[in-house]
Amino acid sequence: MSRLEQIFKDAKAEGRAAFVAYYPAGFPTVEESVENIIELSKHADLIEVGIPFTDPMMDGPTIQHAADIALENGFKVKDTIEVVRRATEAGANCVVMTYWNPVLQYGPERFAAEFAEAGGLGSIIPDLLPEMAGRWKAACDENDLDPVYLAAQSTTMERLEMTTHAGGGFIYAASHMGVTGAQDEVDKGAQELVERCRKVTDLPVAVGLGVRDGKQAAQIAAFADGVIVGSVLINATEQGTLVEVAADLAAGVRAKA
């Protein structure tokens, strides 16, 4: 069992889902992102450290806005390594969420080695399909990193089986069709997607895209192994309420509505 899987196993042993928090490195500055990620890690079991990118295909306006601010403030891909290093030293568990282009430009083998050395546990690369990920998979294997893949409601069972077998750590189940961003209601297809994933894999299944508050987190925690939250944490950062929002979400995950 990988270190990433163990995080979900430990949460399950406590009778709850894992709380997974997405936060972009460099937002609003590198130093502040380190501080905020460390603060989040007091509430979240796992941090998805995002790499700001100029052309994100999956990110909604909130995360795009955060990426723009980070890039305007001079963020570089190499800063991700330092953010993860410092967060890990403070006790955070980190995976990276990025698009393939920044990793490719940096050098996949170099990035994997440096990220793992900094304490990283795995990667989520939405635009890198398993059948195209041979080079990255080799780099992950070499550095004991889990490549995490996404599953959507539109994914066929055949495709789902292939994707889950290729991945590691956990499965990222997209709770609704479209880009990231807080939603008013939990998509009814999310639970069905989790059940479909469980038919073809023993990996934990975490649900993301659209969680707005503790109440929604509790609804998802009732059927998923993990609850992934992102956009609302960025909004909370700008409103000065990150600690309160993180605590509310953590309580929701543990409540299981």
UniProtKB/Swiss-Prot annotation:
<comment type="function">
    <text>The alpha subunit is responsible for the aldol cleavage of indoleglycerol phosphate to indole and glyceraldehyde 3-phosphate.</text>
</comment>
<keyword id="KW-0057">Aromatic amino acid biosynthesis</keyword>
<dbReference type="InterPro" id="IPR018204">
    <property type="entry name" value="Trp_synthase_alpha_AS"/>
</dbReference>
<protein>
    <recommendedName>
        <fullName>Tryptophan synthase alpha chain</fullName>
        <ecNumber>4.2.1.20</ecNumber>
    </recommendedName>
</protein>
<comment type="similarity">
    <text>Belongs to the TrpA family.</text>
</comment>
<dbReference type="GO" id="GO:0005829">
    <property type="term" value="C:cytosol"/>
</dbReference>
<dbReference type="Pfam" id="PF00290">
    <property type="entry name" value="Trp_syntA"/>
</dbReference>
<keyword id="KW-0822">Tryptophan biosynthesis</keyword>
<comment type="subunit">
    <text>Tetramer of two alpha and two beta chains.</text>
</comment>
<comment type="pathway">
    <text>Amino-acid biosynthesis; L-tryptophan biosynthesis; L-tryptophan from chorismate: step 5/5.</text>
</comment>
<dbReference type="GO" id="GO:0004834">
    <property type="term" value="F:tryptophan synthase activity"/>
</dbReference>
<keyword id="KW-0456">Lyase</keyword>
<feature type="active site" description="Proton acceptor">
    <location>
        <position position="48"/>
    </location>
</feature>
<dbReference type="InterPro" id="IPR011060">
    <property type="entry name" value="RibuloseP-bd_barrel"/>
</dbReference>
<dbReference type="InterPro" id="IPR002028">
    <property type="entry name" value="Trp_synthase_suA"/>
</dbReference>
<dbReference type="InterPro" id="IPR013785">
    <property type="entry name" value="Aldolase_TIM"/>
</dbReference>
<keyword id="KW-0028">Amino-acid biosynthesis</keyword>
<feature type="active site" description="Proton acceptor">
    <location>
        <position position="59"/>
    </location>
</feature>
